[in-house]
Amino acid sequence: ACITVKFNAMAEKSRYNYRVEPQDVDFTLRATIPSLGGSILNTAGIDAHGKGFGVDALNADNHSWVLSRMAVEFDCQPTQYTDYTVATWISDYGRVLSTRNFTLTDAAGREFGRAVTQWAMIDLQSRSAIDLSWVGDAHADAIVDAAPPTDKPRTIRAVSPTATAEHRVVYSDIDFNRHVNTMRY
């Protein structure tokens, strides 16, 4: 259940510009899903930082954001050197999860992708989730009165694997929260 907050008429979607660079493409010269996902996650971090609740601010209290769930849809993958914009906005804070939304548009303003992410705040020492009720109160002015661009992510149902693979974890697999890097799995 989400807390009730009054929407601030001044809160608007934030927009950040990107370009598909050579390191972001596959052999067809189209942006890879991990590179587009990376721009989505980078946008989340940049926007949170700009609003005063980025990882740097949270780390001072031994807290951090952790991506809990992510749902993405891409209609196409832009080609190398294509300029695009990622718009982001927060639609709600729940007790445990915050919902952040994204749309990706090309230079002509055509939407080609959308995402909804849900984030938990953790205590870095106990590694447990923190109640976000205070965040909704302290940062109600960051909430934008706009619907998510796609369905919120859901818990993945249990599967019975038919094959297994082993992967030895290496340095580059681990992020700053000491978790497996989001775009690796």
Label each region the model flagged.
Residues 6-185:
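Terminal targeting signals and extreme-terminal segments of soluble enzymes
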